[in-house]
Every structure is written in C-alpha cells, then in structure tokens.
A protein has these predicted regions:
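Asp-box/BNR beta-propeller blade signature and adjacent active/binding-site loops
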Residues: 1-115
C-alpha cells in the first residue's frame, strides 16, 4: 500500500473487509505518486488480503467507501487525468475531480471477484 495518503477501510459484513487506496509508484518532477486506485479484499477480518483489483489507473486519492443499503459497495475518490496529481501550485482547470464507483453486491461474496 502507498504510505502517506488517506485510504479507506469498510466492513462487507461478517469477516469481509475492504481496503481502498492508491497503489502509488515513483514521483516525477511534476506529479506526485498518488495513482492506481486499488481495492483489496480480506475474508479473514483483515488478517490477510487475498484479492486485489485495479479500479482506476491514473491519479487517485482520498477514497471513502460505504456499503449501500442494497449491499453494493460505493467508493468516492479524487481523480485526475494523468499519472499522479500535478504538484505545482498553479494548476489548470479540470486538474482534479471527484468520481464515484458503485460496485456490484457480489463483490462481498466469498466466491466472487472481478475475473
């Protein structure tokens, strides 16, 4: 997991736990290392993370998750159109936006994953 950036943890019911945050990578001279938003799943109460899925491959940060009333997993996060967020103080319009992903309720089923 990328250290130093806010991430989110959410119960999927029973022992199912989800963790969502940027995988991160190398910084550049113009962009930070917050990119590749990942979802990790643990069916053992966060004792081990058995599944992972790339949700968004560009700039991503500050995700928050919740389990909706119909058991779908909702994730809201900051997103950008490049590999990492722009680090300079003067940023162009549209450099960042909020995105929402709604994942199917099956994501919390022990036998299901994205494959």
């Amino acid at each position: 997991f990328e250290s130093g950036c806010h991430a989110s943890v959410c119960s999927g019911g029973g022992n199912m736990v989800f963790y969502c945050g940027p995988k991160g990578g190398a910084k550049s001279s113009t962009h930070d290392n917050r990119y590749e938003l990942m979802l990790y799943r643990s069916p053992t109460g966060a004792q081990g993370w058995t599944r992972s899925q790339l949700l968004y491959d560009l700039a991503a940060g500050y995700p928050d998750m919740t389990l909706l009333g119909d058991r779908r997993l909702a994730i809201v996060f900051e997103a950008g159109p490049e590999k990492g967020f722009i680090t300079r103080s003067s940023r162009p319009a549209g450099w960042m936006r909020l995105d929402v992903l709604i994942l199917p309720r099956e994501v919390a089923d022990y036998g299901y994953w994205f494959e």
